[in-house]
Design a protein with these regions (language model features):
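All-alpha RGS (Regulator of G-protein Signaling) helical domain and cognate RGS-like helical scaffolds
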Residues: 2-6, 16, 20-169
């Protein structure tokens, strides 16, 4: 004898059909407000990324100025600093997306070459720390770039510390 009334299979089928119908009905009503909301969100995200890029580029540019000052004040350090300086220049270019900028010279380097290289190592550490802090707020692509630059900065700081040990006063 066959059961009469509502079966479990029938109840599940009816529930599934109702949910599917409600879901499909929600997909059709596009009145343009969602498009403007998405566009606003994208514009806000682009603004945040541009601000973070500008901040990071300015930080790297300041470091590049420090390298230039040390090389100018102590020409004997130029050969050792050249590859590191070139890398910092490449980082600055990548962050600024080719839009260059200049910064005024900051305070002069230390009174001797050894101290100047030590100060440069400390500046590299600060810059790497700043990029690391910024990458936490950055979108994925910029975060990867900042992570790479921060890692390079940490390596530069180590190399500069070792260079300072070998530099005569």
């Amino acid at each position: 004898m066959r059961r009469t009334g509502t079966t479990r299979r029938g109840a599940l089928t009816a529930t599934g059909a109702t949910v599917l119908g409600a879901t499909l009905a929600g997909c059709g009503g596009d009145d343009g407000r969602e498009d403007s909301t998405i566009a606003d969100a994208r514009a806000a995200a682009a603004q945040v990324e541009n601000t973070l890029r500008l901040t990071a580029a300015t930080t790297s540019r300041k470091l590049l100025v420090r390298y230039d000052q040390v090389v100018k004040a102590y020409p004997g350090t130029a050969a050792g600093l050249a590859p590191l300086r070139d890398a910092v220049r490449a980082h600055t270019t990548a962050l600024s997306q080719g839009k260059g900028g200049t910064l005024p010279l900051s305070h002069p380097p230390a009174t001797d070459a050894k101290a100047a290289v030590k100060e440069l190592a400390a500046a590299e550490r600060r810059t790497a720390d700043a990029h690391t802090a910024t990458l936490l707020k950055a979108p994925a692509e910029l975060a990867r770039l900042l992570a790479s630059i921060a890692a390079a900065g940490a390596a530069h700081a180590y190399l500069l510390t070792e260079m300072a040990k070998e530099t005569s006063s």
